[in-house]
Structures are given as structure tokens and as C-alpha cells.
Curated annotation (Swiss-Prot):
Annotated signal peptide: 1-30
Gene symbol of the encoding locus: ACP2
Residue stretches spanning the membrane: 381-401
Classification via Pfam families: His_Phos_2 (PF00328)
Record PTM: The membrane-bound form is converted to the soluble form by sequential proteolytic processing. First, the C-terminal cytoplasmic tail is removed. Cleavage by a lysosomal protease releases the soluble form in the lysosome lumen.
Name listed for the protein in its UniProt record: Lysosomal acid phosphatase
Source species: Bos taurus (Bovine)
Length: 423
């Protein structure tokens, strides 16, 4: 009996210790991934154009200029596979149209990149296979005409205020110093390429062409030495900073990357309150799109976004019920994505803080903010006021004329009939 009583006491003591430990030990933070937005650059492509003296013209490229290559297709298929692994358990292993929405700019290379990416992300499984020998299924990619794209094709335009900011940027010391320091170099490149309108803002085209040719094993001309290529690469990165930074970066962001950021903020807020969007929203675009967004967010690393690089926005619901945003940038295929931290916030940024910190670079009315002081909108007001003023002036003149004539008639004057009847 004594042993039995001891056994019960030991069990009771164990329960007591476990109960105390459960109260003392902190609860594990349970987080739920609720929503993901991806923005990626297209994969490897042929050059957009050749320079006049280029020995490698468009006929050297199987599909012509600006087209996705087989290497680019593979890059995006591999990115799709990496995303499939990263979001395993969040996304269904097979494609469900209610879960995913993809939008691309209206360029062959971005549309095809999205399709290659989706092939890696959602290989058909079971009943989704329409042919047992084909491990692929069609998944919709949406787009709008380039002329109507006010979300993904940068720089956005026409925007008179942005053009004015660019003109003002050209007068900044940093831009002037670059112009002076590279004047002879640009003259040399212009002479070797046959280009007549080469500048700090257009020299990236030369680097892009040479880079594409070098990547695909085409011989470069003797003047395109490693030192020249390195210098061209630096000027290419400078051209991105000219577009979106150097001078009044926040205002430039409101007119450029802030437009896309506004849509991303709207989607994050909507998913935190109503869950009415797909779980995965994908944008397939360009290096300028990524740089514009990174400049608006204050996370730009100063370099061109490489092929198939991908910015990730992940919306989490914390154990407390509150929401937070985490950002990552995958710019290398052989390592995990880099965590990005919004200036002024932690990496795990509370949604309300994310919205507050990004508010200054989001336009309230893009069309209005694009107008110049005294621009078209103001001109319309001035014209309207001028018309109203002219009408008012004519009415006053007419009224004064009538009054003058009345006062000019002799006192007591009355019309006297002449006595004739007019039939």
C-alpha cells in the first residue's frame, strides 16, 4: 500500500511539474503564410539591337532581336522549380486557377518567361496530363498592350514632370562629373560602334549588345577589352540611377516605381482584410521594373537585376492575428534568396508599418502629379477663366452702352404717330 501511495504521489508530482513548465515556457509562434506577390525579370535573351558597325547583326540570332533564348527558358523553368519547393504546403502541388494569377508585359520574352516559369512551378499531375508523354500544361498569362501598360513597363510615360526631373538631374554635379570623366571614352565607343547619339543615358545599349554576344560565344571586337567592358558595365548601372535616383528620388519614385508599389500595397491590404485575391500573384517584367520598385522601396543594391531575378513579397498572419510583410530577392540561382529590409522597419515588418513607411512614395493622382506647374491642367483653367472674363467684359460693355443711350435721349421725348396706317 505504501508503494502504491508513493506511485500516485510521483504521478501527481510529475503532472504538477509539467503544468508549471507549460505555464513558464513561451508558446511557439505559429505563423501562417497568407499571400505571395512575385516580380521577376525575364530570362536570358538576344540583344535588343545591334550597333551600326556590329559584325553580328540580327540574322545571327535564331529568333531575331530581343527574344528569349533556350538558356532563358531553362532559367525560368528552374526558378519555377525553386518556387515550387519554397511554397510547398502553401500552394497546391497541382495547378488550381483560383490560386494563381499571372500578368506580363506584352513582350515575347516576358510572356514566354512566365510560361516557362509556370511549367516548372506546376508540372501536370494525374488527370491534368493531356498527353502522357508531355510533362506540360497550358496556364494563362494575362497582359495589356504596351501603350496601355501603366503598371509594369518602365519608365512610365508620358509624364512631363518626370521629364523635367530628368532635365534637372542632368544639371546635378554627379551627372556633370560623370559626363566630363567619360567624355573621351564615349567618343571612342561612338567611333568604334558608328553611333552618333551616344551619351551616358544610351551607352547601356552598347554594353547590352556586347554582353549578349559574349554570353553566347560570339567574338567581341578588339576594342571591347575586359577593361572597356567593365567600364561600360559601370555606366550601365549609372544609367539606372539616372532614371530613378540621384536627384529627388522620392518624387521620381512617386511617378515611377511607386505606381507598382501602390498596387502591391492595395493587394496586401485586401488580402489582410478580405482574402478575395488568389494566393499567388505574379508579375513578369524587366530589369527596369525591378530597379524602379527597389528604388521606391529604398532597397536598390546599385546593380542591374540579372536574368530571372525575383523579388518576393510574403504576407504572414502572426499568432496574434496581426499581419506582417517579409521581402526577399533571388538574384543567384545557387543560393537562398536574400532577405530585404525596408528602411525604418525590421525584416518582419508589421503590415501597418510597411504601409506607413511606403506612403510617401505612392502617388495620390499620377496623372495630376505628372503635370508641370503651368502645364496642360493649369492651362485649361486659365483658358476657361479667360473665356468667362471675356464674356463678362462684353456684358458690361453692352450694359454700359444701353445705359448711355437711355441717358442720351432728350427729356420728355415721346414718339408721335404720323397718322398713317401700315397694313
Amino acid at each position: 500500500m505504501a508503494g502504491r501511495r508513493f506511485g500516485w504521489s510521483r504521478a501527481a508530482l510529475l503532472q504538477l511539474i509539467l503544468g508549471v513548465n507549460l505555464m513558464v515556457m513561451p508558446r511557439t509562434q505559429a505563423r501562417t503564410l497568407r499571400f505571395v506577390t512575385l516580380l521577376y525579370r525575364h530570362g536570358d535573351r538576344s540583344p535588343v539591337k545591334a550597333y551600326p558597325k556590329d559584325p553580328h547583326q540580327e540574322d545571327k540570332w535564331p529568333q531575331g532581336f530581343g527574344q528569349l533564348t533556350k538558356e532563358g527558358m531553362l532559367q525560368h523553368w528552374e526558378l519555377g522549380q525553386a518556387l515550387r519547393q519554397r511554397y510547398h504546403g502553401f500552394l497546391n502541388t497541382s495547378y488550381h486557377r483560383q490560386e494563381v494569377y499571372v500578368r506580363s508585359t506584352d513582350f515575347d520574352r516576358t510572356l514566354m518567361s512566365a510560361e516557362a516559369n509556370l511549367a516548372g512551378l506546376f508540372p501536370p499531375d494525374g488527370i491534368q496530363r493531356f498527353n502522357p508523354n508531355i510533362s506540360w500544361q497550358p496556364i494563362p498569362v494575362h497582359t495589356v498592350p504596351v501603350a496601355e501598360d501603366r503598371l509594369l513597363k518602365f519608365p512610365l510615360g508620358p509624364c512631363p514632370r518626370f521629364e523635367q526631373l530628368q532635365n534637372e538631374t542632368r544639371r546635378m554635379p554627379e551627372y556633370q562629373n560623370e559626363s566630363v570623366q567619360n567624355a573621351q571614352f564615349l567618343d571612342m565607343v561612338a567611333n568604334e560602334t558608328g553611333l552618333t547619339d551616344l551619351s551616358l543615358e544610351t551607352v547601356w545599349n552598347v554594353y547590352d549588345t556586347l554582353f549578349c554576344e559574349q554570353t553566347h560565344g560570339l567574338p567581341l571586337p578588339p576594342w571591347a577589352s575586359p577593361q572597356t567592358m567593365q567600364r561600360l558595365s559601370r555606366l550601365k548601372d549609372f544609367s539606372f540611377r539616372f532614371l530613378f535616383g540621384i536627384y529627388k528620388q522620392a518624387e521620381k519614385a512617386r511617378l515611377q516605381g511607386g505606381v507598382l508599389l501602390a498596387q502591391i500595397r492595395k493587394n496586401l491590404t485586401l488580402m489582410a482584410t478580405t482574402s478575395q485575391l488568389p494566393k499567388l500573384l505574379v508579375y513578369s517584367a524587366h530589369d527596369t521594373t525591378l530597379v524602379a520598385l527597389h528604388m521606391a522601396l529604398g532597397v536598390y543594391n546599385g546593380e542591374q537585376a540579372p536574368y530571372a531575378s525575383c523579388h518576393m513579397f510574403e504576407l504572414y498572419q502572426e499568432d496574434s492575428g496581426n499581419f506582417s510583410v517579409e521581402m526577399y530577392f533571388r538574384n543567384e540561382s545557387h543560393r537562398a534568396p536574400w532577405p530585404l529590409t525596408l528602411p525604418g522597419c525590421s525584416h518582419r515588418c508589421p503590415l501597418q508599418d510597411f504601409l506607413r513607411l511606403t506612403e510617401p512614395v505612392v502617388p495620390k493622382d499620377w496623372l495630376q502629379e505628372c503635370q508641370l506647374a503651368g502645364g496642360p491642367a493649369d492651362t485649361e483653367v486659365i483658358v476657361a477663366l479667360a473665356v468667362c472674363g471675356s464674356i463678362l467684359f462684353l456684358l458690361i460693355v453692352l450694359l454700359l452702352t444701353v445705359l448711355f443711350r437711355v441717358q442720351a435721349q432728350p427729356p420728355g421725348y415721346r414718339h408721335v404717330p404720323d397718322g398713317e396706317d401700315h397694313a
